[in-house]
Amino acid sequence: MVRPGDRRPMITDHAIVVLADGGARALTHQAVDRHAGLPAGSTSYYFRTRAALIAAVVERIRVHSRTAFDNAQAQSAGPVTAEGAAALIAGQLRNLTGERWDQALAVFALLGEVREQPELRDALMRCLFSVDLA
C-alpha cells in the first residue's frame, strides 16, 4: 500500500506514462487515476487542476533530468575534452532514448500545452538541453 505522503511523486510518474502513451489530450485526472490504480478523484485531490498536474509533471521531469545529468557529469570527472563531452552527450541521449523514453515523449507531448506559459515551457526545454551548462 502506498503511503499518502508518497502519492504525489507516484501520481506524476503515472501521469508521465499517460502522456507518453496517449499524448497531451490523454492527460486527465481520471486517466491518471485509472493508470495508477487509484480510487476515482485521487489525482484531483493532490492536483486540483489540469494545470497543476502539468506543472507537477514538468517539475518531476526537470528533477529527473537534472539528476541524470549531474550523475553523468560526476562520472566524467577531470578536465573537459572533446572526447569527454561527446561521451557525455552520447550517454545522455542513450539515457533519454532508453530508460527515460517515457519522459522524453511526455516532454514533447507537453510542448504544445505550455507554449503560452514561459516558465513551464523553459523548464521543459531545460529538460532536453541547458544552454547554461553547454
Residue ranges of model-derived segments:
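Short, Lys/Arg-enriched anionic-surface-contact patches
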Residues: 1-7
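Helix-turn-helix
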Residues: 7-10, 14-56
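Generic detection of well-ordered alpha-helical segments
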Residues: 9, 13, 51, 55, ...
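Solvent-exposed, amphipathic alpha-helical segments
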Residues: 10, 14-22, 67-71, 75, ...
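Hydrophobic alpha-helical connector segments
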Residues: 56-59, 67-104
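Short secondary-structure transition hinges
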Residues: 86-133
